[in-house]
Amino acid sequence: MGKAVIAIHGGAGAISRAQMSLQQELRYIEALSAIVETGQKMLEAGESALDVVTEAVRLLEECPLFNAGIGAVFTRDETHELDASVMDGNTLKAGAVADVSHLRNPVLAARLVMEQSPHVMMIGEGAENFAFAHGMERVSPEIFSTPLRYEQLLAAREEGATVLDHSGAPLDEKQKMGTVGAVALDLDGNLAAATSTGGMTNKLPGRVGDSPLVGAGCYANNASVAVSCTGTGEVFIRALAAYDIAALMDYGGLSLAEACERVVMEKLPALGGSGGLIAIDHEGNVALPFNTEGMYRAWGYAGDTPTTGIYREKGDTVATQ
């Protein structure tokens, strides 16, 4: 095992230079870079991968640019339903929450489920009451709302569409995927992953995608890899996308790059799925593959300058230390 490393994502989809101003680009790049730098400093200080991914996703939830926490999209009923998961590659313990509306940071609730309950996943009112009982504050769902998200809901209604993220266009492979996530490898060789989302604009209330499902949108195992996904949630669930990366490495003998190529570029498209993922293997190799036009992403080894990206760039999808 080499240097500690962190990678994060803020969603994948039809993200082209023609559609985004330089000012918009800079806002995303600055936000992603700052969060990775925080994670790098934590790793340098010897903090655990689990703490690093939890904090990175919490910060992504606090940033209204991304569809998780503050800035989450609206359901068809003009409500917010948030999902999150976290997994510790050292112990294989995991925690997740789904359909929560009164918790500012769902990833912290997922961490509570993992550490303070005998369960892996809790949903709705029960998950919220559990979090309140363990010290999390009850907040008004209004804190998640932004004018842009509401405009997108109205646009989606007009189109009669369900959309994944903040473009306001119909749900298809051309759209941005509204999920955030983080993966990390710490100085002790432990891996961890976390994923959080506000779901899909104009979705039916009660819909749950891959983000809170261990093995679909999030997975970590010290023996192989940590993965966080973003994309067409229903397809990622059917493909067990996050776990499939680990399985191909464990049982198929594939490298991280080969496993990611198989899942993201072959298996998911065959099922009609668009999106991407971030992954770090137990040796510290990093992969950030996506089959869409772009993916908000950033990564960096402890002590190095963060690398950020939005669009597809030649040679930037896999990095080795």
Whereabouts are the PLM-identified features?
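Alpha/propeptide regions of enzymes that mature by internal proteolysis
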Residues: M1-Q321
